[in-house]
């Protein structure tokens, strides 16, 4: 991390001597620091505590000012563990917010919240840095072009297409496949994407962060031999980090992405896994700062904190940031304040369903709950729009009939309804797809399906052309031709058994 020029600079040394405080209280990750009268630091300024603990181990803790308490005291939140700190230790006000390295030097590297490399590959060039707190682009700078961002995932491209330069949310409870879906999107988009990507791991499992790093090295997205040719920068603040780090690591990743957009004028992909942990960390910090909790125990500033982050993730006339964010849904309740606040900022929502995951349909994307502002005839075209609407109507009718089927059975339905149910079950299975990143689990090679192929496949199912084929032929296949080939194989297998 580089906040200011080196401390050997005499001007900086004088200012540091002037702006020296003392720790007056420590409660977990929160420090109260007393400063001389008239030398109070600003909100969001970085404070650094250096010294040695009782065992002689070196201490270097960076904090961020959150409150001015009066009586020349400030309250700050630590970005790393506070073990070894004690009252009376010197604290230096750095005079600026946290600043992190940006630009080409960040590619192929893993950083923590302070912008320090944590991959044991040596130091990073810190000549170009940027503060993590800044205002969103002015309204007049924003870009309003509308175009589809193809992912190669059938259910997403057909029913809830993503916007290039937009914000996308992947909503789901624990264990329904958010991280697998985000890794597949990285695989499909980041590899084919000409620009750069930034991945922010916010409060998730360290193992998943390690898996992602290894996978990116294998696929060539990170080039170990020549890091400058890498296409991604990784910023991690995992589950074991203090709440201050988890609350700010998203801003560190966003700051790196903003530099590529504004200075290099590139199209950037920003992946955040998981935005709920950002809210959760904010809630922890809010309680530590003594604020009165709001609904369900969340911080009273929830909407403001979310808005401050999300408004910076946008596309300008210089370049774009396309953001894909995983959102954990506590107890599968989409009305919980954290996911509900996130909904308002998104162009497309991909909702993952536990019911579909239980059926073994992966990706477990709920075709009726997932939405997109892009699914309009003037944007996607009449053919795409009509096909998507017919698929949704068929699945909605099947959903309505499920209670009748459960009580009376299929035989009691009309001929038309039985046909609808048969097609809906084929559609449901055809919405599943083998993923590249899940090959070890499914045993099937991953498939990328173009948008035109996706539309053709669903149109053929809706037209009744494949009414005679068994529904299992449509499960975990790529395009419709693979489904017909699978049906032929199944028929041959059944004949051989006889």
UniProtKB/Swiss-Prot annotation:
Cell compartment(s), UniProt: Plastid, Chloroplast thylakoid membrane
Binding site for ATP: 172-179
Bilayer topology annotation: Peripheral membrane protein
InterPro entries for this protein: AAA+_ATPase, ATP-synt_VA_C, ATP_synth_F1_bsu, ATPase_a/bsu_AS, ATPase_alpha/beta_chains, ATPase_F1/V1/A1_a/bsu_N, ATPase_F1/V1/A1_a/bsu_N_sf, ATPase_F1/V1/A1_a/bsu_nucl-bd
Keyword entries, A-Z: ATP synthesis, ATP-binding, CF(1), Chloroplast, Hydrogen ion transport, Ion transport, Membrane, Nucleotide-binding, Phosphoprotein, Plastid, Thylakoid, Translocase, Transport
Keyword Transmembrane helix part of the UniProt annotation: no
Substrates-to-products reaction catalysed: ATP + H2O + 4 H(+)(in) = ADP + phosphate + 5 H(+)(out)
Superkingdom field: Eukaryota
EC number: 7.1.2.2
Enzyme class at the top of the EC tree: translocase
SUPFAM superfamilies (UniProt xref): C-terminal domain of alpha and beta subunits of F1 ATP synthase, N-terminal domain of alpha and beta subunits of F1 ATP synthase, P-loop containing nucleoside triphosphate hydrolases
Record-level GO cellular component terms: chloroplast thylakoid membrane; mitochondrion; proton-transporting ATP synthase complex
Alphabetical list of Gene3D superfamilies matching this protein: 2.40.10.170, Bovine Mitochondrial F1-atpase, Atp Synthase Beta Chain, Chain D, domain 3, P-loop containing nucleotide triphosphate hydrolases
Molecular-function GO term, any one: ATP hydrolysis activity
Phosphothreonine PTM positions: 6
Modification Phosphoserine occurs at: 13
Alphabetical GO biological process terms: proton motive force-driven mitochondrial ATP synthesis
Similarity annotation: Belongs to the ATPase alpha/beta chains family.
Function: Produces ATP from ADP in the presence of a proton gradient across the membrane. The catalytic sites are hosted primarily by the beta subunits.
Binding partners and assembly: F-type ATPases have 2 components, CF(1) - the catalytic core - and CF(0) - the membrane proton channel. CF(1) has five subunits: alpha(3), beta(3), gamma(1), delta(1), epsilon(1). CF(0) has four main subunits: a(1), b(1), b'(1) and c(9-12).
Protein name: ATP synthase subunit beta, chloroplastic
Originating species: Olimarabidopsis pumila (Dwarf rocket)
Gene behind the chain: atpB
């Amino acid at each position: 991390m580089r906040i200011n020029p080196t401390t050997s600079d005499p001007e900086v040394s004088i200012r540091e001597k002037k702006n020296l405080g003392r720790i007056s209280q420590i409660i977990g990750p929160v420090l109260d620091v007393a400063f001389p009268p008239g030398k109070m630091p600003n909100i969001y300024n970085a404070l650094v505590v250096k010294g040695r603990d009782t065992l002689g181990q070196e201490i270097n803790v960076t904090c961020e000012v959150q409150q001015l308490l009066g009586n020349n005291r400030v309250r700050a939140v630590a970005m790393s563990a506070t073990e070894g700190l004690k009252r009376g230790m010197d604290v230096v006000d750095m005079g600026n917010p946290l600043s992190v390295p940006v630009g080409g030097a960040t590619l192929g590297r893993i950083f923590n919240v302070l912008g320090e490399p944590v991959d044991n590959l040596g130091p990073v060039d810190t000549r170009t840095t940027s503060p993590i707190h800044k205002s969103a682009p002015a309204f007049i700078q924003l870009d309003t072009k509308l175009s589809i961002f193809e992912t190669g995932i059938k259910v997403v491209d057909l029913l809830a297409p993503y916007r290039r330069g937009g914000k996308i949310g992947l909503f789901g409870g624990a264990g329904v496949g958010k991280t697998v879906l985000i890794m597949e999107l990285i695989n499909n988009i980041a590899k084919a994407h000409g620009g750069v990507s930034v991945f922010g791991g916010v409060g998730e499992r360290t193992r998943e962060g390690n898996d992602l790093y290894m996978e990116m090295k294998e696929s060539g997205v990170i080039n170990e031999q020549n890091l400058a040719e890498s296409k991604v920068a990784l910023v991690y603040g995992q589950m074991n980090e203090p709440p201050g780090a988890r609350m700010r690591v998203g801003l560190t990743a966003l700051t790196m992405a903003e530099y590529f957009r504004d200075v290099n004028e590139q199209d950037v992909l920003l992946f955040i896994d998981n935005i709920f942990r950002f809210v959760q960390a904010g809630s922890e910090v809010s309680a530590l700062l003594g604020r009165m909790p709001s609904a369900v125990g969340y911080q009273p500033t929830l909407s403001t904190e979310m808005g401050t982050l999300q408004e910076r993730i946008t596309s300008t006339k210089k370049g774009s940031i396309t953001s894909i964010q995983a959102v954990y849904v506590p107890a599968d309740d989409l009305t919980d304040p954290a996911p509900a606040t996130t909904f308002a900022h998104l162009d497309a929502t991909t909702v993952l369903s536990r019911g579909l995951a239980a059926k073994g349909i992966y990706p477990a994307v709920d075709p009726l709950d997932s939405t997109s502002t892009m699914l309009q005839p003037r944007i996607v075209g009449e053919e795409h729009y009509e096909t998507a609407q017919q698929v949704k109507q068929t699945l909605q009718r099947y959903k309505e009939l499920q209670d009748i089927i459960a009580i009376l059975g299929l035989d009691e339905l009309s001929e038309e309804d039985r046909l609808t149910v048969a097609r809906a079950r084929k559609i449901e299975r055809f919405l599943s797809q083998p993923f590249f990143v899940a090959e070890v689990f499914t045993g099937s090679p991953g498939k990328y399906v173009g948008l035109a192929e996706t539309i053709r496949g669903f149109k053929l199912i809706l037209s009744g052309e494949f009414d005679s084929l068994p529904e299992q032929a449509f499960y975990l296949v790529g395009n419709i031709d693979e489904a017909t080939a699978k049906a032929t194989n199944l028929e041959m297998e059944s004949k051989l058994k006889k």
